[in-house]
Amino acid sequence: MNLIAKLEQEEIERALAGKTIPEFAPGDTVIVNVNVVEGNRKRVQAYEGVVIAKRNRGLNSSFIVRKISSGEGVERTFQTYSPLLASIVVKRRGDVRRAKLYYLRERSGKSARIKEKLVSKDRAAAAQQ
């Protein structure tokens, strides 16, 4: 491993100190808790939506979450290893065949639904152990 890769790995480990990032993929519904600073107050804001893209670039990894707010589509890009992220919770697994779900931008209502990925009983039992 070269020097830059080592430094990047150290920064990732430092960013993950004390928190875990779950495995998630495009199509999954996630709740991202973000630390927001307003003046001298600090609070946690939840942002729930569907992951439409994931970009794996080491320390520069990011993902885009899309939600419908008051009838309008809202997308937000999060840096995976940002210190502003308090936590990420996977609420629902989506069953999709694409890595980038940008086509959801043009769709609304029933056509924008994503099938739920059902886990077999064998895998569910193995995951809990």
Curated annotation (Swiss-Prot):
Presence of keyword Ribosomal protein: yes
GO molecular function: structural constituent of ribosome
Gene Ontology BP annotations: translation
Record-linked PROSITE patterns: RIBOSOMAL_L19
GO cellular component: cytosolic large ribosomal subunit
The entry's keywords: Ribonucleoprotein, Ribosomal protein
Keyword Ribonucleoprotein: yes
InterPro entries per the UniProt record, alphabetical: Ribosomal_bL19, Ribosomal_bL19_CS, Ribosomal_bL19_sf, Translation_prot_SH3-like_sf
One Pfam family in the UniProt entry: Ribosomal_L19
HAMAP family: Ribosomal_bL19
Family: Belongs to the bacterial ribosomal protein bL19 family.
Biological role stated in the UniProt entry: This protein is located at the 30S-50S ribosomal subunit interface and may play a role in the structure and function of the aminoacyl-tRNA binding site.
Name of the protein in its database record: Large ribosomal subunit protein bL19
Organism: Burkholderia mallei (strain ATCC 23344)
